[in-house]
Amino acid sequence: MKLCADILYWRLKEKLTTVTQRGKGGSALTLNRPEFYLDRSQSFEKNRVYVCSADHLPQSPKLGENVCLICLGQHWNLSAYYDRCSVILVEGNWDIFRVFNLVQEIFNRYDSWEDQLWTILRHGGNLPQMLEASRGIFENPMLLIGSDFRYLGVTEEDYLRNKLGLQLDTQSFD
């Protein structure tokens, strides 16, 4: 599954305390799995995530569209990237291999979710099953409403009923 810089940023922020996002963010799901940036390379391919050390970045890079750099540390040249791509800064004393593995885990999590949804769809599952499979991704109560404003499925029904006061037994917003 392809992801976006915003998802990567928020999921990394859950694990690492010193993460900030700069440059072009975005919610379009265009980014492929990460790769390590190899020193001396001047070009960054479009729709790619690169995990790198900020002090190893080139001064005059060729940046494709929708590039996301996950940079460890700061460097004076880094501000030149902010107008041209998404930059997720990881400050502090983090191991580059650990950060790379965390990014891989984020992609694995979303790939697993996509696989679950396809399995449910292929085996004639229903919408409540899809909602249940999505709970770990959205991490909030969900309410699926049809075009006729009837409830098609809910998660955490007790929360919706007791905390938000929704009367789910009427099957609509009447």
Locations of the language-model features?
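Alpha-helical/coil-rich non-catalytic "connector" segments in signaling and regulatory proteins
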Residues: M1-D174
